[in-house]
């Protein structure tokens, strides 16, 4: 009985951490956003990564506040072709592009103010 209880607790704890996101990045959306001069935020994540989950919550709030910004994401270990295209080697990477230029990049950042500053960077 004790082993079953421990198994259930461990299973539940992993489900709490899991991100229920889907890949929203496509080359077409990214290229169009850059041609239109839009600020584009790209988040690389993994569904079992706690840091990624914290970043996703901050970026979900940012979507509500930054109406003119395009937010795209992808699962880094699953979508390796996207990671290679964007030169992203790590989960927890947030990259901001504007006018076909990379404006800023961070890895592991979970501070809301710093992420918002990254989005606003020129």
Feature annotation, model-predicted:
Residues 4-13:
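Sec-dependent N-terminal signal peptides
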Residues 10, 17-37, 118:
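N-terminal leader/targeting and pre-domain segments
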């Amino acid at each position: 009985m004790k082993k079953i209880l421990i198994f259930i607790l461990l299973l539940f704890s992993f489900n709490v951490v899991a991100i229920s996101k889907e890949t929203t990045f496509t080359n077409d959306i990214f290229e169009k956003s850059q041609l239109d001069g839009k600020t584009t935020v790209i988040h690389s994540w993994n569904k079992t990564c706690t840091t990624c989950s914290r970043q996703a919550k901050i970026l979900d709030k940012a979507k509500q506040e930054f109406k003119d910004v395009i937010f795209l994401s992808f699962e880094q270990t699953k979508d390796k072709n996207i990671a290679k295209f964007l030169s992203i080697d790590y989960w927890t990477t947030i990259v901001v592009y504007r006018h076909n230029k990379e404006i800023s990049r961070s890895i592991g950042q979970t501070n809301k103010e710093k992420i918002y500053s990254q989005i606003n960077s020129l």
